[in-house]
């Protein structure tokens, strides 16, 4: 099993929790983490707000699975809804969950160590690896195919 707690440390964790906490203080508060990753921030949000629920969105199915396992181990799975999607699909995600309002939205934009350190994903320039660079590996279009088939104007 991958020790995800040591793969990616959430950036500015205490500051993020302190910023989100006031919005999540009331009963039935709903938070959305639009870039769930390995759930470091989300676990802290749910621990700080025991009455809140959280929808975790990520387009990386591997990260989503690992985050879900972490939530289960932390005893937070009953207040966590994992969703495989991109953050620009937030409106649809909320509609699918019959949620009309949220109290807090969080985004930690960029790559995580999970993507960079996994050589075969092709995000690191430090290793000779396939030029994949897909955040969602279920999608067929790789960086290699783009570079091989797109003309300069498309790039």
Task: Describe these PLM feature segments.
Residues 1-155:
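S-adenosyl-L-methionine-dependent methyltransferase catalytic core, i.e., the SAM/SAH-binding region
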């Amino acid at each position: 099993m991958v020790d995800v707690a040591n793969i990616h440390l959430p950036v500015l964790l205490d500051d993020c929790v302190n910023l989100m906490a006031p919005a999540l203080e009331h009963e039935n508060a709903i938070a959305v983490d639009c870039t769930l990753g390995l759930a470091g921030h989300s676990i802290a949000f749910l621990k700080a707000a025991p009455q809140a629920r959280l929808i975790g969105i990520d387009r990386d199915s591997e990260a989503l699975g690992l985050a879900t396992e972490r939530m289960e181990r932390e005893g937070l799975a009953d207040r966590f809804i994992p969703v495989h999607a991109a953050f620009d699909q937030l409106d649809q995600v909320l509609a699918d969950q019959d949620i009309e309002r949220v109290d807090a939205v969080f985004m930690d934009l960029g790559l995580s160590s999970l993507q960079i350190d996994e050589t075969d994903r092709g995000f690191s320039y430090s290793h000779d690896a396939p030029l994949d660079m897909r955040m969602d590996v279920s999608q067929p279009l790789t960086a290699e195919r783009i570079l091989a088939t797109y003309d300069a104007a498309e790039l």
